[in-house]
Amino acid sequence: MRYIIDHDFHIHSGGSMCSGDPNQTPARILQYGVDEGFAAVALTDHFWDETVPMPMGGWGPDFYGSQNYPHISKNLPLPSHEGIRFLFGAEVDMTLDGTVGISKERLDTMDFALISISHFHCTDFTIRAEDAATPEGRAQVLLDKLELLLTYDLPWHKLGLAHLTGQKLGGGDPAFHCEVLRLVKGERLTHLFKKAAALGVGIELNTATFRFGDDAEEQAVVDFYAHAKECGCQFFFGSDAHREDGFTYHRARGQRMADALGLTEADIFRV
């Protein structure tokens, strides 16, 4: 049976440094979920666990230095509403040296967390500038980071891989993005998708990154996730909304992707 979107697992509050929207409060986020008739929404502000040593290079310290647990926990306790779950989580980065910005102990206190391996605009923190400059470099780093991440002992049942495709991966250029996605294809990606499926980690379909004006790029993205589906991966949807206007496109874009992939309930990652 056709899957109808019933959740949004990637939402930032005004507390995320790249938001700054005073109207993007937990109460507003919950109301959005209620208005959409969702079964669940997740608050996932950018976060670096202060108990995890941060590599002191590039973009990271300036961005993450103040986005620690005392900062993101200012949103607690989350408001509640009958009929919808409101999950407390975070979005964390994996750096170029393989450090994931959250400890297992902190993960135990959260309902859900997103791990990004593809914030490739954060040069010299998540990727070396010389690797970010070419499709070949980005493709290699994406595969290397995914392979390493999947060796870690983590509570995969409540973790999602954020925006594996999109402008963070492709630099905002459709042709460049398509070339990166072409280069990651192959037996290695198949192996990694199968391992991700076996571990039970969710794969995000990030509706903020779907660009439907370029047919070649859209098809490349659909093909990438169709391959993940063939390998047994399960998916969740995230608007990546940083401001109120980020909510407006989520259902329509997500449903288009769900239909393109032929998703059913069996393909959906649940927390």
List where the protein language model places each region.
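Charged catalytic cores and adjacent phosphate/nucleic-acid-binding surfaces used
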Residues: 1-15, 26, 31, 174-271
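A metal-dependent hydrolase metal-coordination microenvironment
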Residues: 2-140, 144, 244-248
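Short loop/turn motifs at secondary-structure junctions
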Residues: 36-40, 109, 155-160, 262-264
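Divalent metal-binding pocket/active-site signature
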Residues: 48, 112-195, 199-214
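Histidine/acidic residue-rich metal-binding segments in metalloenzymes
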Residues: 65-81, 85, 105, 134-160, ...
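Residues that form or immediately flank small-molecule/cofactor binding pockets and catalytic motifs
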Residues: 91, 166, 270
